[in-house]
Curated annotation (Swiss-Prot):
Similarity remark: Belongs to the NusB family.
Organism: Dictyoglomus thermophilum (strain ATCC 35947 / DSM 3960 / H-6-12)
Top-level taxon of the source organism: Bacteria
Keyword flag Metal-binding: no
Entry function: Involved in transcription antitermination. Required for transcription of ribosomal RNA (rRNA) genes. Binds specifically to the boxA antiterminator sequence of the ribosomal RNA (rrn) operons.
GO biological process: DNA-templated transcription termination; transcription antitermination
Gene Ontology cellular component annotations, sorted alphabetically: cytosol
PANTHER family the UniProt entry points to: ANTITERMINATION NUSB DOMAIN-CONTAINING PROTEIN, N UTILIZATION SUBSTANCE PROTEIN B-RELATED
Name of the protein: Transcription antitermination protein NusB
Pfam families found in the cross-reference section: NusB
Amino acid sequence: MSKERTRCREKVLQLLFQKDLGQEVEVDFSDFSPQGQAFAYRLYDGALQYKDLADSIISRFSKNWKLERMGALERNILRLAIAEMFTFSDIPQAVTVNEAVELAKKYVSPEAGRFVNGILRNIVRNWEEVKSLKEGFVDVTPEN
């Protein structure tokens, strides 16, 4: 399942990236097993639900980097990882961070992997504060 989960993350990242660029997206995870589909749909829904909160967290914990200055892929990889941490408490944060770093290295560059790693490690180190931000978050996500 872990290799399939990696492929699910890649597919969700592609959808988030397209959506971030204002493109229409077709959400279809039918090429995955039933468990993979469930994981992918839940991850995608979580990424949409927590997008504004994730952006706030990224802005708070990325030293000297404004969200809008980040590349769209890096920004969406970070959003995806934060959503995964909130949505799947059974997945160790170290696994989520590693998967995000691998996505950044594969789709952007080794430097992007280090960038994503640094921000996510900072978020994980400050997880109690991050959870308190989540508790104060009001979901204003429009219904699709």
